[in-house]
Amino acid sequence: YFPLTATRLMMKLGVVSSKDVIKMNFNNKKQSADLNYPIDSLKYEVHSNPKNVVLIAIDSWNYRAFNQDITPHISHFADSCSRFTSHLSSSNGTRGSIFGLFFSLSSIYWTDFEVSGIQPLLIEELLKQNYQIGIYPSATIVNPPFAKILFSKVPDLRTHTEGKTVYDRDCRITADYL
């Protein structure tokens, strides 16, 4: 038995849309009854003046390039923010690293979360507190299925950004965000 999917081909041919892919229910996979996430409930205080939350994920970027000389705008932005520098990546690859960033777990649990529909606690809590969540991807978030695993409950989810080149997409993302 060798599992095979044609998701990208079907999207390219217009047979299914990215929204259809996000809503797919993979009934052929065994449901995980052992998934217990989160183990403890989140404890926090709701403030009358909630803070803005900006999470920037740059794929295949060496942290040593994060400095005033190489990335002055990002560096300047970070200087005026709270920075969390103790995060340890759960993988060297995009899929595992992003999964670990949002779930704080090893990507060995990827399939369990894909099947269960359980969303990251961060996203659940931001939605519960009525934060406006904007996802601005340069690459598609349909494959790997970040849209389904991380953001399926985010309203009006943007799964891709139009543009012929990475530069075009990055310019569009910057303009849309600002």
Give residue spans per PLM region.
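Active-site-proximal alpha/beta segments of enzymes that process anionic O-linked groups
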Residues: 1-178
